[in-house]
């Protein structure tokens, strides 16, 4: 990948000038001036997904200039580098190949002169065999009973992705009950252990190194709890499996290394649900549905790697995001799924985006003088409408939003889905076009009221509109369409990182807090007053010690 400061490109300068021309143009004006706007600014994917980006503060000229920025920063070369297995994660000297994990075409992908696909396929086959034994009841616990509950112990990418997907695909789940434990707060593991039976529970310990503090603390607590009932340590092997590469530590824990499922350094944690980390997904929805998930992502991978930038959905969404973040000063983006099963989707891409692109150092090692990753947040609709939409509609912050909904629901109860979708359509219309003072006054007249007598309240009922949104309408949320949707966002994040000249696939920002926690932990082992930190940290630690005594 080339290291190009985007602000030094001619495209950036052209975009800055274009912004000066566009900043006062409204979405309403753009629609009024172009009856074909929806057709020009929307696209479908595989007849499964419609992406409507027409309700944005953009024109064809805007997109052309953003495409020029992508060309000047060599996005096409970066895409080729990633898919060909080059070590684009330079700070860790690693390839970035989550795309290999879902490479259903099985074309060779070479890393260090070796095709990785045979190993990928071997682990997939091993996961298939193991999961079928668990799901069928062939696998027995230490008292001869079949497994009924699965507890996934992991954190970050080893938790957020599998949890999000198993929730999103609940309509496809089998009889096994899934639980996820991530927080080192003992409350998390304690509450899950109250719900399960040691005789019929399988624990998945998800840690590449088998040394992650939070995960291993929870894993040892689960093991201790299990042995209080099982007694003999040899029974651990029937109730624990590992998603790891550290065979020695896995064996010492008591897990049979035959039940250790490997993944590789070229799999980043927040892109790992496609790997052995996805074993909990397979145990929840079955291997065939997991393959469909992979296939949907692979279809989006092919779209991203082969479609011209002008029609490339991840690239278009990425460019629009850069437009708002860097030229309009929008600091956040909201992801708003109108589907209750997707309630963890925003949280998943909060990590996916903010851990990937939340960086102030560029690929040359210099501090940037422009905006990089946005703040990502969101909740399912319609809950959000009764919480934070007020600020999106009438606040002083610009919050570009992605609205996501399925046309077909898995639960066609009465008219619930029509009411849900009526809100989905209404919100983007309201955000784009608002409500003028004239309309508010006319509404009063239609009610037989005199607007002049209600002047004190009229300004509060006016909506400026001009709030940008993307709408992503899925035919239905299936394993295939969910896989494609996740990959769409993954590639959007990668595209923005390339253009903004940052390393998307490392996460050094999580390290300092860990280091300091390891230093502080032994200081909490006694009641001595602490004076080795700043006055604030000393004061907090000493008050903690006083109160726990």
From Swiss-Prot:
Keywords: Cytoplasm, Gluconeogenesis, Glycolysis, Isomerase. The keyword Isomerase applies. The active site is at residues 355, 386, 514. GO terms for molecular function: carbohydrate derivative binding; glucose-6-phosphate isomerase activity; monosaccharide binding. The keyword Ion transport does not apply. GO terms for biological process: gluconeogenesis; glucose 6-phosphate metabolic process; glycolytic process. Its main location: cytoplasm. It is an enzyme of class 5 (isomerase). One of its GO terms (cellular component) is cytosol. It comes from the Bacteria. It holds the Pfam family PGI. Pathway: Carbohydrate biosynthesis; gluconeogenesis; Carbohydrate degradation; glycolysis; D-glyceraldehyde 3-phosphate and glycerone phosphate from D-glucose: step 2/4. It catalyses: alpha-D-glucose 6-phosphate = beta-D-fructose 6-phosphate. CDD domains: SIS_PGI_1, SIS_PGI_2. InterPro entries: G6P_Isomerase, G6P_Isomerase_C, Phosphoglucose_isomerase_CS, SIS_dom_sf, SIS_PGI_1, SIS_PGI_2. Its EC number is 5.3.1.9. It is found in: Cytoplasm. PANTHER family: GLUCOSE-6-PHOSPHATE ISOMERASE. Belongs to the GPI family. Catalyzes the reversible isomerization of glucose-6-phosphate to fructose-6-phosphate. This is Glucose-6-phosphate isomerase. It comes from Salmonella typhi.
């Amino acid at each position: 990948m080339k290291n190009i400061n985007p602000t030094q490109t001619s495209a950036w300068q052209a975009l800055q000038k274009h912004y000066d021309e566009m900043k006062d143009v409204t979405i309403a004006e753009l629609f009024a001036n172009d009856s074909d706007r929806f057709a020009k600014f929307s696209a479908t994917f595989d007849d499964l997904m419609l992406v409507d980006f027409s309700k944005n503060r953009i024109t064809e000229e805007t997109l052309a200039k953003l495409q020029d920025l992508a060309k000047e920063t060599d996005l096409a070369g970066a895409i080729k580098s990633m898919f060909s297995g080059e070590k684009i994660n330079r700070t860790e000297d690693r390839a970035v190949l989550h795309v290999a994990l879902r490479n259903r075409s099985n074309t060779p992908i070479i890393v260090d002169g070796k095709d990785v696909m045979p190993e990928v396929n071997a682990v997939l086959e091993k996961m298939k065999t193991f999961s079928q034994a668990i799901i069928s009841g062939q696998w027995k616990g230490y008292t001869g009973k079949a497994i009924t509950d699965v507890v996934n112990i992991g954190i970050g990418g080893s938790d957020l992705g599998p949890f999000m997907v198993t929730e999103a695909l609940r309509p496809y789940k089998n009889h096994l009950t899934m639980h996820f434990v991530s927080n080192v707060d003992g409350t998390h593991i304690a509450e899950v252990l109250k719900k399960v039976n040691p005789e019929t529970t399988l624990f998945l310990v998800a840690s590449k190194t088998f040394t992650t503090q939070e995960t291993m603390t929870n894993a040892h607590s689960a093991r201790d709890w299990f042995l209080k009932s099982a007694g003999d340590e040899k029974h651990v092997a029937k109730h624990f499996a590992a998603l790891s590469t550290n065979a020695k530590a896995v064996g010492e824990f008591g897990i049979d290394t035959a039940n250790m499922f490997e993944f590789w350094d070229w799999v980043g944690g927040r892109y790992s649900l496609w790997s052995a980390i996805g074993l909990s997904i397979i145990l929840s929805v079955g291997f065939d549905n997991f393959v469909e998930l992979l296939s949907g992502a692979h279809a989006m991978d092919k779209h991203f790697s082969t479609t011209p930038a002008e029609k490339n959905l991840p690239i278009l969404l990425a460019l629009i995001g850069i437009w708002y973040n860097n030229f309009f000063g929008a600091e956040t983006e909201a992801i708003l799924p109108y589907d209750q099963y997707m309630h963890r989707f925003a949280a998943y891409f909060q990590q996916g985006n903010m851990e990937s692109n939340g960086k102030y150092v560029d690929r040359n090692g210099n501090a940037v003088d422009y905006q990089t990753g946005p703040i990502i947040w969101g909740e399912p609709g319609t809950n959000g409408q009764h919480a934070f939409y007020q600020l999106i509609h009438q606040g002083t912050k610009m919050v570009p939003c992605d609205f996501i909904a399925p046309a077909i629901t898995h639960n066609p109860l009465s008219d619930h889905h029509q009411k849900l979708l009526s809100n989905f359509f209404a919100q983007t219309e309201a955000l784009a076009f608002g409500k003028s003072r004239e309309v508010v006054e006319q509404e009063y007249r239609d009610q037989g009221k005199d607007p002049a007598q209600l002047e004190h309240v009229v300004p509060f009922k006016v909506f400026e509109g001009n709030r940008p949104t993307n709408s992503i309408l899925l035919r239905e949320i299936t394993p295939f369409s969910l896989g494609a949707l996740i990959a769409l966002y993954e590639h959007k994040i990668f595209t923005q990182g390339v253009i903004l000249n940052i390393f998307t696939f490392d996460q050094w920002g999580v390290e300092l807090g860990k280091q300091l926690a390891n230093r502080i932990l032994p200081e909490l082992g006694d009641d001595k007053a602490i004076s080795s930190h700043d006055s604030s940290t000393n004061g907090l630690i000493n008050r903690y010690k006083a109160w726990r005594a």
